[in-house]
Every structure is written in C-alpha cells, then in structure tokens.
From Swiss-Prot:
Keywords: Metal-binding, Methyltransferase, RNA-binding, S-adenosyl-L-methionine, Transferase, tRNA processing, tRNA-binding, Zinc. NCBIfam families: TRM1. Residues 63-92, 491-578 are annotated as: Disordered. Disulfide bonds: none annotated. Residues 564-578 have a biased composition (Basic and acidic residues). S-adenosyl-L-methionine binds at residues 43, 113, 131. GO terms for biological process: tRNA N2-guanine methylation. It comes from Drosophila melanogaster (Fruit fly). Dimethylates a single guanine residue at position 26 of most tRNAs using S-adenosyl-L-methionine as donor of the methyl groups. SUPFAM superfamilies: S-adenosyl-L-methionine-dependent methyltransferases. It catalyses: guanosine(26) in tRNA + 2 S-adenosyl-L-methionine = N(2)-dimethylguanosine(26) in tRNA + 2 S-adenosyl-L-homocysteine + 2 H(+). GO terms for molecular function: tRNA (guanine(26)-N2)-dimethyltransferase activity; tRNA binding. The lineage of its organism: Eukaryota, Metazoa, Ecdysozoa, Arthropoda, Hexapoda. This is tRNA (guanine(26)-N(2))-dimethyltransferase. Its EC number is 2.1.1.216.
Length: 578
C-alpha cells in the first residue's frame, strides 16, 4: 500500500544537535526534548481544523454583529436605514491580527506545533507555547527566534493546569486550547474547560490506547470514568469514552460540547470539539450517554441510554422537551441469540461524533486552498471522505471476520455482506477506525440471519456443533428471510473505495508508535528498540560476572599495607579432602 507521509528533513549540524524541518518550520533539537515525527498527520489535521474553525467563527461573529445592528435599527424605528452586511475580513498566515485567534498549546515540548500554527493559520492574534520543562522552554525560545515568529508566539514556563486556571478571566481566555500529552489527557480537561471562551475549540489527543481499548478496565474507570469492553470496535469505543469524559468535565461548569471531528489514527485518537455555555443544553447530556451490554458468547452488543427525551410543546415554547429515565435493562439475563450472559460497560458517548458540515468544510479547504500542500494531504482527504460516509446515528460497529469466527464460517466477502444488508432494506457504511468495519442500522438478529443464510452455501463442520456453544445456538435456528449475495447492490462499494483514496495506510517506519518521553525519535541518536534489547539478559549477566571477578581479584586491604608482613590479611587454610 502506498504511503503518502513526507518524512521530516534532518540536518546534523553537530553531534548533539539536529535541525528538523517540517513544512516551513525548523526545529533545533539536541535530544533532550520530546519530538515525534509520526504525528505529522495530527499536526496537519489540526492546522486544517483551526483554519476552518477561524472561518466559521468569523462568519458567526459577523452574523451576530449584523443581528445586533438590525435590532438597534428596529428599536430606533428607522425604516430608511437598512443594515448592510459587511464583507468578511481577509486574513493571511504569519501576520498578527488583534481580532484573531488566541491559541494555547499547553504541552509544547519543542514548540513545533505552535510554530507551524503561526506560519500556517490565517488570523492569529497570539499563540502561547507552554511547557513545564526548563529545557523545553529553552528549546521553544531558540526555535521561535530561529523561525522569526516572535510576534505571534509567547513562550511560557508553567504547569499547564496552573496556567489554564490563571486564564479564566474573560480577557485572558483562549479561543482554542490544544492538549497533546504523553498518555491520558484527563487531568488537563478541567482547566481547559474554564479557560475557553464560549464556543471555543478544544483539541485533545490520547495515546493510552491499551487502557481505552479494554486491556485495563479498572484503570480506564479511574482515568476516564468509564468501563471499556474488549471488542473489535474498541477504537471507536475509545473515541466515545473520551467524549464522555470531556462532556462530564464540561457539565460541571454549565457547559456542553459539540463534537466536530473524532479521529482514530495510528496509535492515538484525536478529538475536535466546540465548548458552549448553556444550562438548558447541559440537561440533554444524560440522553447522549449510554451503557453497553456485550454478550460473552457471540459478542452482540446493545446500548442502553442513561436518559430519554420526549416532546412536550407548550404555547410559549413549542420546542420544549421532557426528560425521563428509561426502563431497563435493554437485554434479558441471557442473550437472545446464543443464550450466554452479558458484560456491562460504559457509560460512553452515544450521540454523533462528527459534524457533517464541519467535515465538508474541512474537506473542501484541504482540497481547494493553500492547505492542499500539506505533507499528509492525501491521507487527510481519504480519512475525511470515509468520515463523510459513516452513519452518524449508529454507534460502534461489527467486523465480518469476528462474526464469522463465532460461527466457524468461511468469511463473507465485505462487498457481499454489505450488499446483503442493503438488499434487506438497511443502511451500512465503513468506519474510518477499521478497514474491516461494518457499521449498520440492521439489528443483530438480521446480521445473524444473513450468516445463517451464508452457512447454507458454506456449511460448518458438524464436529464443531457443540451443544451449548454460540455456534450451535445460532445455527440451530431457521432463516427468517432470503438474502441476496450474488447481485451486488449499487451502493455496496462506497465512493472512497472506488476512488482508491488513501484510507488505511501501512506503518511507514519500524516501531511506529508514540515514542518515549523527552527524546528525539529520529536519526542515529537512538538505535531501534529491537537492536538495543538483543542479548540484553546475557549482557547483563556477563557484566555482573565481570564485576564479581574484578572484586575477587582486587585485595581488600592493599591500600592499608605499610610494608609489615604481619599486617597482611591472613589467607584461609585449605582443608585436605579424602
């Protein structure tokens, strides 16, 4: 598979220093500050999102000003004066604007992200590049001067949480806060919620995917307040767990979130949300969260919302809603498909995780503006195209390989499976989080019925029909409908697949991952882990043995010997053995 990532250029000026080039930014790094080149896609996507956010924010402010002007004219009863909308201002990247965005990068490290923001985002007033490490702040200062962006970037040496708590006054708040920590971002969310303006943009990265994917549910509950389940859709579940965590922090201050874009890529997840103030909207948060039941046998999942809303129109408020608590549980004590019991996980965010209008604006900007020269532009287009095709009202997904594994069946080809679902009258899509995903509004009973129909063509070995197994329980039932596998549905093959877009790319380098703290992960300064750990135990034992030999060969009292034989340490007597 073709890889479209452009590798950063590295110029070694001395043994302890590298100059890293990414787009127009140059970073001087001596190996003491964290830099990870694999997150270029993350940085490119963030730059594109902030540019689109600034455009939308400018439009919203213009509309708000026009509405205020019309109200003022109406109060004055001046019919001759008609407010004329002003043309939106034109911004250029690299120039300071007093009415521009104020951005905080709370964990800046080398300052690469902030420098790229200053160079590539149009309409910026100030970027605060903060880090707790003195070495990192020194590196930020060096890199700011090296790239000549002193006018736009203000370095800050402070604890990220302290800085955000000290920025809660209206005049000190930020339009956008970028949190890209090493691991879990939960401890920074509380401060971020308080230092954002109304309608501000929060950009959050989480790299502790092992925790979010269900390997340590107890740790995930401590960090995110949610219990994950080990499922094939674990990457989308990770997105929904993080959104649930962000929403819970927002609700404490009478705020709520609107997810614009939620991406699972490589070894991390990246979320873009707008944070608004509104007590009435906060009440809807309960209905946006759900528990999830997962069968321990066939792994069928069912969602149980925490709250429900019903229309309750009145003369004064036709849009009024009534809030209620749903009845439950949503499943029986035993699975209706295979008879096994259930695991309970969550709560997770069960509302849409993308804003289709924002995604469309972002896709247009990446294809038609100066953003089309981004290093990972081709991959961004592919991922956003898949996001557009996703079913926004269907949380989580199945995978054909896992469904067929439960029934010990030959795997149904993806296009045939999608076609059968579409012919049955349901909707289906991929998820950007997995190339084998099957996101559909078809109930699980229909999916198992399709596989029962498939088993007629590809029978299961009778020896595997063990009583009490999910396989035997599901295949013992008769098919309730006839499903079409041979005639391909016109919508079975999505546009992103037909266009051969870069949807899922292979790892471009060995040991593609989050890297380690405070070190440069490129060049010859650091050997690959596989080489460093070769014969590690043998080398450790050899060094210990050498240390013992050196200790035995060295007399302990030689330094105290003054020439008198009587002062020499006595040698132990050797006993003769028979």
């Amino acid at each position: 598979m073709e890889v479209d990532e452009e590798k950063p250029q590295i110029i070694a000026e001395n043994p302890n220093e590298n100059v890293i080039r990414e787009r127009n930014a140059e970073i001087v790094s001596g190996g003491n500050v964290f830099y990870n080149p694999v997150q270029e896609f993350n940085r490119d996507l963030s730059i594109a999102a902030l540019n689109v956010y600034r455009q939308r924010l400018t439009k919203e402010r213009s509309e708000k000003a026009l509405k205020k002007q019309r109200k003022k004219v109406k109060e004055q009863e001046d019919e001759k004066t008609t407010p004329v909308p002003e043309d939106p201002p034109v911004y250029e990247a690299g120039t300071r604007y007093e009415d521009g965005l104020r951005i905080l990068e709370a964990l800046a490290a080398t300052g690469l992200r902030s420098i790229r923001y200053a160079q590539e985002i149009a309409g910026v007033r100030q970027i605060v590049a903060n880090d707790l490490s003195r070495q990192a702040v020194a590196s930020i200062n060096t890199n700011i001067r090296h790239n000549k962006v002193e006018e736009l970037i203000e370095p800050s040496h402070s604890d990220a949480m302290t800085l955000m708590y000290l920025s809660t006054q209206p005049e000190k708040r930020f339009d956008a806060v970028d949190l890209d920590p090493y691991g879990c971002p939960n401890r920074f969310l509380d401060g971020a919620m308080q230092c954002l303006v109304d309608g501000g943009l929060l950009l959050v990265t989480a790299t502790d995917m092992a925790v979010l994917a269900g390997n340590a549910p107890e740790a995930c509950y401590v960090k995110y307040g949610s219990v994950p389940l080990r499922m094939k859709c674990c990457h989308e579940m990770a997105l929904r767990i993080l959104l649930h965590c962000i929403e819970s922090h927002a609700n404490r201050y009478g705020k709520y979130i609107e997810p614009l874009l939620s991406i699972s890529a490589d070894f991390y997840i990246r979320i873009f949300v707008r944070v608004y103030v509104g007590q009435a909207q906060c009440k809807l948060s309960m209905s946006k969260q759900s528990w999830i039941y997962q069968c321990t046998g066939c792994e069928t999942f069912t969602l149980q919302p925490l709250g429900i809303t019903k229309p309750n129109p009145t003369a004064g408020n036709p849009q009024q809603l009534k809030f209620g608590i749903p009845t439950g549980p949503a499943v029986n004590s035993q699975c209706e498909h295979c008879g096994h019991r259930h695991h309970l996980g969550g709560p997770i965010w069960s509302a849409p995780i993308h804003n289709p209008e924002f995604v469309q604006d972002l896709l247009t900007a990446v294809q038609e503006t100066t953003l089309q020269s981004l290093g990972t532009q081709r991959r961004i287009v592919g991922v956003l195209s898949m996001v557009q095709e996703e079913l926004q009202d269907v949380p989580l997904y199945y995978t054909p390989d896992k469904l067929c594994c439960v029934l010990k069946l030959e795997i149904v080809p993806m296009l045939k499976f999608r076609s059968a679902i579409l012919h049955a009258g349901y909707r289906v899509s991929y998820s950007h989080a997995s190339k084998n995903s099957l996101k559909t509004n078809a109930p699980p009973a229909v999916l198992w019925d399709i596989l029962r129909s498939w088993s007629k063509r590809h029978p299961v070995n009778p020896e595997r029909m063990i009583p009490g197994s999910p396989l035997a329980a599901i295949l013992s039932k008769e098919c309730t409908a006839v499903y079409e596998f041979d005639e391909l549905h016109p919508e079975a093959n999505p546009k992103s697949r037909k266009s051969a877009l870069s949807r899922f790319q292979e790892n471009p380098t060995p040991h593609w991952g989050p890297g380690t703290r405070a070190t440069i992960m490129i060049g010859d300064n650091k050997l690959p882990k596989s080489y460093r750990n070769q014969n590690k135990k043998q080398r450790h034992k050899a060094s210990e043995q050498q240390a013992e030999d050196d200790q035995q060969d060295t007399p302990q009292a030689v330094d105290e010997y003054d020439g008198d034989v009587e002062h020499l340490p006595k040698q132990p007597k050797l006993e003769a053995t028979a």
